[in-house]
């Protein structure tokens, strides 16, 4: 009888479940085929070594993929499709469950929405008094290193939805999640603007490449 380590990813998944697969095996399952002279497991291993992790792989752009032997446009499209499926899954899950059950769930959702974006995107999650999700919206879009945020528009949308609280989030395409002075200032402005309408700002999360910063966790909110 074959041991689990000797099984191909598909057979291993069918026998022991998807969670039994390593990152290399899971990637090989999606890639399906290798390249001339290189089987799919070897290709998957080399790709992960190049990008460091699944996170680094799925947030990479095509220019970064071009430096990897065996990755053409077709396989790049496959991998970006996987990332988009994950993003849509979290979006649907958020809408259907209508609840942020933990800080981890909030972070995972925001990472799924903002990772890999080439411009700064400012997203707001609107919550009711029980912290159930009413809506999440990409309210502002900017450049590579700046996004202009208008606090009054956030408040206007919150009032329209009858929201009692909001969670702010934006990405840093550079990869470093550390907040800038401008990030801190705009957070203060949004908080002050929301306070006039008795709307709480629960957190502001900055999403980088494989890292994040939570203003609430740092005691800034």
Swiss-Prot record:
Sequence motif JAMM motif, location on chain: 170-183
Descriptive protein name: UPF0758 protein YicR
UniProt family annotation: Belongs to the UPF0758 family. YicR subfamily.
Pfam families: RadC, UPF0758_N
Binding annotation for Zn(2+): 170, 172, 183
Cross-referenced InterPro entries: MPN, RadC_JAB, RuvA_2-like, UPF0758, UPF0758_CS, UPF0758_N, UPF0758_YicR
Cited SUPFAM superfamilies: RuvA domain 2-like (SSF47781)
Gene this protein is translated from: yicR
Record-linked CDD domains: MPN_DUF2466 (cd08071)
NCBIfam families: PRK00024.1, radc
Keywords, comma-separated and alphabetical: Hydrolase, Metal-binding, Metalloprotease, Protease, Zinc
GO BP of this protein: proteolysis
MF annotations from Gene Ontology: metal ion binding; metallopeptidase activity
Domain MPN: 99-221
């Amino acid at each position: 009888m074959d041991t689990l380590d000797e099984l191909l990813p598909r057979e291993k998944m069918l026998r022991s479940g998807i969670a039994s697969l390593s990152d290399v095996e899971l990637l090989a399952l999606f890639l399906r085929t290798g390249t001339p002279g290189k089987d799919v497991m070897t290709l998957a291993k080399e790709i992960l070594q190049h990008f460091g992790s699944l996170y680094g792989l799925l947030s990479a752009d095509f220019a970064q993929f071009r430096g990897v032997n065996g990755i053409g446009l077709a396989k790049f499209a496959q991998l970006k499709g996987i990332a988009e499926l994950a993003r849509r899954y979290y979006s649907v899950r958020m809408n259907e469950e209508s609840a942020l059950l933990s800080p981890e769930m909030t972070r995972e959702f925001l990472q799924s929405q903002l990772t890999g974006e080439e411009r700064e995107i400012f997203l707001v999650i609107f919550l009711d008094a029980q912290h159930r999700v009413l809506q999440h919206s990409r309210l502002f879009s900017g450049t590579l290193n700046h996004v202009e945020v208008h606090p009054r528009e956030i408040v206007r949308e919150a009032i329209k939805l009858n929201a009692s609280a909001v969670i702010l989030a934006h990405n840093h395409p550079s990869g470093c999640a550390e907040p800038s002075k401008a990030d801190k200032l705009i957070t203060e402005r949004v908080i002050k603007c929301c306070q006039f309408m008795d709307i709480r700002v629960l957190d502001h999360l900055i999403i980088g490449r494989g890292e994040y910063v939570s203003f609430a966790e740092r005691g800034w909110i």
